């Protein structure tokens, strides 16, 4: 059971005039309200430096709302108000406290409940946290604070950030958001693994020969290169999103779904990870598309000339424990590729030849986005007079299996709801970040010493660096023979 908030809560969004708040935070709050997962009695206050009237603020945040009729939108916006003031002076926070107290006294709230959402860059985290604690955080209340990534740039900056925040708030009050943990298929991983004996019994190095977690974006930096140039793909999605997926995929069974039990097991498996071999990493940067219509990374005017920023990376992770020792695990991610997709591929050992001269390997594919799906590639006899086998699949595609009446929350909707309920399961704990930065910092330092970096160029809209296929084969992945597997419909020309 969780320590849930009640019906009279003040939700305060800092950075309310920013892109993140407009595109993610407020649409998520509206989505919860639309689905009656957020009480209609809460108060929502936006706080930012930008000078906006209440009307302009409401027009701004509602531009990305999905679904709901005009009445629902109007009812939600009636809960919202805006305060414009600097982040580093007391004045605005005193206005904020006055507005909170007015709401709480009007509704006779005995124990104030406040949720602070920091949709802000890390450079102002400390200032805002100090001001909140000083001016808007009475001792007798129940409060929670949501912090957005990045949680530092490396181990040193993470520790510095933690040193600033930990004296102000307890770990129980802090909710570090990695939106990948709110994705439906990621939340399904523990049930899939531990709720099915079929998988539970074979989820180990006796049966699995290869694991891949891949993240593909079909677009480049498109004018946002100035931000990406300082981050790179490893810091942007691999140290956080893909690592979170990997820990859920490889952790041991927790004693329960209790948040601390789950997070304890994630930390345990992280501690079994071997150091990443910086000499066994495939790095790339996209160039112009083959037809010349899409610009290369260095053509982005916001990028440093001759930048060595990594837009594609693949590397192997080794886990030294009884379950995973010897299984090659490859994380790979890239921008400006042929499609946008995130998925997990788990390949199993081959069956003994004997009866079969040639037979393909079983493979479990878990598609996180888009269009959530789980399918298991299996061998089956080709229908008709043939005695040949071909690969087919057992397929669970959410859109065809579950009726459209199912509300599948967006990642931010799911996570804000979890925070409201007091459920920490899908948020990142301090010691988890400490271990993950210890793992990734040496890799990042090696990659960012530019003289060491060998970047493979790949065309915008391609599958990635041409060396990728060989890299995957070298790390245990066996590709299907050409023509043996056809998706989604198998034709008579199957080999």
Curated annotation (Swiss-Prot):
PROSITE patterns: G6P_DEHYDROGENASE. Catalyzes the rate-limiting step of the oxidative pentose-phosphate pathway, which represents a route for the dissimilation of carbohydrates besides glycolysis. The main function of this enzyme is to provide reducing power (NADPH) and pentose phosphates for fatty acid and nucleic acid synthesis. Belongs to the glucose-6-phosphate dehydrogenase family. It comes from Cyberlindnera jadinii. PANTHER family: GLUCOSE-6-PHOSPHATE 1-DEHYDROGENASE, GLUCOSE-6-PHOSPHATE 1-DEHYDROGENASE G6PD. Signal peptide: none annotated. The active site is at residue 241. GO terms for molecular function: glucose-6-phosphate dehydrogenase activity; NADP binding. The modification N-acetylserine is found at residue 1. HAMAP family: G6PD (MF_00966). D-glucose 6-phosphate binds at residues 149, 179-183, 217, 236, 335, 369. Pathway: Carbohydrate degradation; pentose phosphate pathway; D-ribulose 5-phosphate from D-glucose 6-phosphate (oxidative stage): step 1/3. The keyword Protease does not apply. Its EC number is 1.1.1.49. This is Glucose-6-phosphate 1-dehydrogenase. It catalyses: D-glucose 6-phosphate + NADP(+) = 6-phospho-D-glucono-1,5-lactone + NADPH + H(+).
